[in-house]
Structure formats: C-alpha cells, structure tokens
C-alpha cells in the first residue's frame, strides 16, 4: 500500500509543495485565495498529507502520554517522514494535561515539548487537538462539558497556557479544538439558556405561539418551555428550534475557545475535527445523533474546516453500489463544508490485512484500493488528507486494528 502513499507524496513535492522531509522551518498560513495553505515566508504551497498518530502499543484507547516514550516516538516519526508524511494529528488528553481545572500539568507539557522537537526535526508538522477523554475524564467536565462555566474556564486556561508556550512554533500546523465534538441531547442546566434563546428569537410569546401553533402548550412560557423528545417528527417546530439551539451552544463553545487561543497565540491556524454526521445525511431517525457542530456555522471562527469520513453507507467491498454510494457520500460531505475556506479530510481510511471485530477480512491491497479511491474522489473538494491511524493497533476494538499505514510491527504494508 505504501508504494501508493510514497508516490502521491512525491507528486506533491514535485508540484511546488513545501518541502517533504528535512527540518521544519516556516509556519503555515492560509493561501491568499482561501483555497489552500502556504509556507511562510517562502510562499511554497503546503498540502497536509499524512496520518493520525499515536503509539500503537499503548493500549486501547491509546495512553500516548501516560506511556510516552520519546525514543519510540522518534522512531515512528522517522518512519512517517520516510513515507512522505508531512502532517500528523495527535490527541492531547484532559486527564494528563489538565487533571485540575486550575492548572495545566508541567510534566505533560514537557512531554509535548519533546514530541514537538521530534516533529520539527523530522519535517512532520502537527495538528494538536484539544483535551479529550482517552486517558480519563476529569471531574470538572461534570455536569456539563460543553456549556458549563467550570469546564469552559478550564478550556480558557488550557488554551491560554499552550498558546503562550508554543506561540510561533513552526512544527505546529494548527490547533484542533476537539476530536469529533458532539453535544448531548439535553442537560438540565440548559433550561434557562433555552428560554433566553427562544425569547431572543421570537421576542414575544405571541410570536412564539404563531410559529409553533398547537405545539406550544398554554402553560408554557419562556422559563418553562420543555425540550422536545428525542424522536424524529417531520415539521415539528419545537424540534427544529431545539436543534438550532444546540447549534447555538456549539457556536458559543467554538467562539470562546478561538478567542482564548487568539489572545495568546495569533500565529497558528485553528480548526475543529468535525464528525461526519455534522452533515445530517445518515442517522436522521434519531435527532440526538446530530452532533450540532455545523461546519457551515462554526467556520466563521475557524481558519479551515477539518471533516472526518468513514464508509457508513454499506461496506465498500460488498458491492459496486456500496462502493459508489460511499464515494458519493464522501464528496457530498466535503462539498457541504465549502464556505470559502480550505477543507481538510482529517480522518479517513479503512482496514486491510485482517478482520477487525464484527467485520469481514480484507487484504492490504483492498485497503490500498479504497484509500486511493477516497483521495481521487476528493481531490476537487479538499486540500489535505490525514489517514486513520498511523499503525495497526493490536488492542483496538474497531477498524484501527488493521487500519494503519504500517503494520503493528512497523513494517510497511
């Protein structure tokens, strides 16, 4: 498979793309046409072409920071660089980097210092995600991770700390606020905000009644309007407004973090790793499965859009129809993300060389065919590709078990 990866990377290098291999020097900016990226100050075009990285032998979910081994990481980055990878996306974890809401852990930051130095030497730039749950869930995420003031203040502190520490660092391509954020359907503490949002939208109860008609009960007022049931119901105005309210909460979550980052680090790009059902094509029968993070809304605060995609409309190799349907789905999702800013396919891929849990066995050649098909199908609608994951992961419970660019023993597929 990696003959194809190396070939594609070689083509990018010949096409005037910022250097493949060698130490990282200049920072990356959005190009003047808003369609891609350039290296500063050279002006060379930069196409992020790489993978999502974690050490494949640190368990599942991977404990990349608790079991951090700089020698192993350096070996992995050397392999990636040799394959033509110029970008790696890496998760930061809340329980390791910020177990206490009031401070960011210095020991964890020193590990990140070491990883950034490795990346800089290898020529592989980094997309670093905001604090996630892989190594545990901190107490301050409760009761409300996305709209609770305690959790939001912790995020403010996290980004101000990292922004100040790594401002201007050329090895960092971008900050990714969070991997695949997804709002819950309802949190009890949202009730006052829901009432205020409705009042701002409709101004008077008469206007709300006119819009909702019989859906609004006589006893309901701004402070007592109930959220809808998590049940699909076409043309239900309460359900529509609730989804718009959830999007509003997601807007505020994105805006606040971006402002915290910009205050201490105006030098790096910012994005969000959107889950693919941020575009509500699948799972429409269950309203809560809509993530409420909408790239067409939240892109106003971001420098580029980062969308994730896996083949959910049937398995690609079960039929030509499933193959074609999934590629059309990919193109549709990416086209939806176009708002005048670059679009990166931040996770994609499939598996080969075995059979993950509950999935049929596929060969490495079949994995290669699908990855190449995804790249070819998306070339007109995206400007970067990061496969999932770097290496086959023995303890994985999903396609990551055989989804790597390399095998678990680090030999090339």
Enumerate the predicted regions with their spans:
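Active-site mouth of glycoside hydrolases
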Residues: 27-302, 314, 352-355, 362, ...
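Active-site neighborhood of phospho(di)ester-bond hydrolases with catalytic His/Asp-centered motifs
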Residues: 273, 344-347
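Boundary at the C-terminal end of the N-terminal hydrophobic targeting segment
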Residues: 18-20
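Active-site flanking residues adjacent to catalytic metal/cofactor-binding acidic residues
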Residues: 175, 179, 307, 346-347
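Substrate-binding surface in catalytic domains of secreted glycosidases
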Residues: 188-192, 313-332
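Bacterial N-terminal signal peptides
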Residues: 7-16
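Bacterial N-terminal signal peptides that target proteins for export
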Residues: 1-6
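Surface-exposed substrate-engagement region within the catalytic domains
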Residues: 335, 360-379
């Amino acid at each position: 498979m990696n003959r194809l990866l190396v070939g594609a990377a070689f083509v990018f290098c010949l096409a005037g793309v910022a250097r493949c291999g060698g130490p990282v020097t200049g920072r990356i900016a959005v190009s003047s046409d808003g369609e891609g990226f350039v290296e500063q100050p050279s002006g060379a075009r930069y196409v992020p072409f790489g993978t999502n990285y974690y050490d494949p032998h640190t368990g599942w979910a991977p404990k990349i920071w608790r079991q951090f081994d700089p020698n192993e990481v350096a070996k992995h980055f050397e392999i990636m660089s040799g394959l033509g990878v110029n970008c790696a996306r890496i998760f930061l974890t809340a329980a390791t980097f910020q177990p206490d809401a009031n401070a960011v852990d210095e020991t964890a930051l020193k590990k990140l210092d070491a990883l950034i130095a490795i990346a800089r030497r290898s020529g592989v730039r980094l997309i670093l995600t905001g604090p996630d749950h892989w190594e545990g869930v901190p107490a301050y995420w409760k009761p409300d991770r996305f709209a609770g003031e305690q959790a939001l203040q912790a995020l403010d502190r996290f980004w101000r700390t990292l922004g100040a520490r790594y401002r201007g660092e050329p090895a960092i391509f971008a900050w990714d606020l969070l991997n695949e954020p997804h709002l819950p359907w309802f949190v009890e503490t949202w009730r006052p905000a829901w009432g205020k949002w409705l009042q701002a939208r409709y101004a008077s109860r008469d206007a709300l009644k006119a819009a909702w008609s019989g859906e609004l009960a006589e006893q309901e007022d701004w402070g007592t309007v109930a959220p809808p049931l998590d049940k699909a119901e076409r043309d239900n105005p309460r359900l529509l407004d609730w989804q718009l309210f959830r999007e509003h909460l997601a807007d505020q979550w994105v805006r606040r973090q971006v402002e915290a980052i910009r205050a201490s680090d105006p030098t790096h790009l910012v994005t969000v790793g959107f889950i693919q059902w941020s575009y509500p094509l699948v799972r429409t029968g269950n309203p809560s499965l809509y993530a409420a993070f909408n790239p067409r809304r939240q892109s106003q605060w971001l420098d580029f859009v980062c969308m994730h995609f896996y083949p959910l409309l049937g398995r690609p190799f079960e039929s030509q129809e499933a193959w074609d349907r999934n590629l059309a789905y990919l193109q549709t999702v990416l086209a939806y993300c176009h708002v005048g800013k670059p679009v990166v396919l931040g996770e994609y891929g499939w598996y080969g060389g075995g059979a993950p849990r509950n999935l049929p066995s596929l060969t490495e050649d079949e994995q290669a065919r699908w990855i190449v098909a995804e790249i070819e199908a998306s070339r007109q609608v995206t400007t970067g590709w990061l496969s999932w994951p770097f290496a086959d992961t023995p303890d994985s419970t999903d396609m990551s078990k055989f989804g790597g660019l390399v095998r678990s023993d680090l030999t090339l597929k």
